[in-house]
Regions:
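Short histidine/acidic/glycine/proline-rich micro-motifs that form metal-
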Residues: 10-14, 135-139, 170-171
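Structured loop/turn residues at beta-strand edges in well-structured enzyme cores
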Residues: 78, 96, 123, 156-159
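Glycine-rich phosphate/pyrophosphate-binding loop and the adjoining helix
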Residues: 26, 139-190
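Conserved nucleotide-sugar donor-interacting segment of glycosyltransferase catalytic cores
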Residues: 105-117
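N-terminal beta1-alpha1-beta2 submodule of the flavodoxin-like/Rossmannoid cofactor-binding fold
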Residues: 1-103, 107, 185-190
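Residues at the starts of beta-strands that form the adenosine-phosphate
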Residues: 2, 35, 126-128, 160
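Hydrophobic residues at beta-strand termini and immediately following loops
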Residues: 39, 131, 164
């Protein structure tokens, strides 16, 4: 079984989201062993689409040449059995690196198709887990990042999504370690 870990965390040495995500993956591994592939988006330096790169990609799409390297992230995402995305709550959603990554995996013909009956997802994953931390005491429902990822997952054919979060970490007097432990404990019971 292949687990794809999309790591959109920055300041990785001190990232609370990354700490929580590593704990979540460890708990998953205890239940079912996975071959984990981690993509550190900050290191990948994926460029946003431009007129030139989009036109080149669309030309390949029209020819059905999905084996080209430009689609490697999309194929990797499609072929994963389980997906974990770790992204801190920034500007009501997630870091720009994750948005750029999504632009590179959102490919008609690789991760989904449009038919006369609507979209059909092509991804193998049975579940996508979104891991995040928030400084404020906001609920998952207020996290536009998770909501966006959940909608995309359904489009790609991934019916089960979950958000594992720790909130209120920057509230004055918050016990950050306790909040992270509580989130991990709650995730372990799922």
């Amino acid at each position: 079984m292949k687990l794809l870990f999309v790591n959109a965390c920055v300041n990785r040495a001190t990232s609370r989201t990354l700490k929580l995500a590593r704990g979540v993956i460890e708990a998953m591994q205890a239940q079912e062993p996975f071959e984990v592939t981690e993509i550190v988006l900050e290191e990948e330096k994926i460029a946003p689409l431009t007129t030139e790169s989009l036109n080149a990609r669309q030309a390949l799409e029209q020819k059905g040449e999905f084996d080209d390297g430009v689609f490697s992230y999309a194929r990797q995402f499609r072929d994963a059995d389980r997906i974990v995305i770790a992204a801190p709550f920034w500007a009501s959603s997630y870091p720009a690196s994750l948005k750029t990554y999504i632009e590179h995996i959102d490919i008609v013909g690789v991760n989904y198709l449009f038919t006369e009956h609507g979209p059909v997802g092509l991804c193998k994953a049975d579940k996508l887990t979104y891991v995040t931390t928030r400084g404020g005491a906001l609920p998952d429902e207020a996290d536009c990042g998770y909501q966006n990822i959940a909608v995309l997952a359904r489009l790609y054919g991934i019916e089960k999504t979950e958000c594992i979060s720790a909130a209120g970490l920057d509230v004055i007097g918050a016990n950050v370690d306790a909040l992270l432990s509580e989130a991990l404990e709650k995730a372990s019971r799922k």
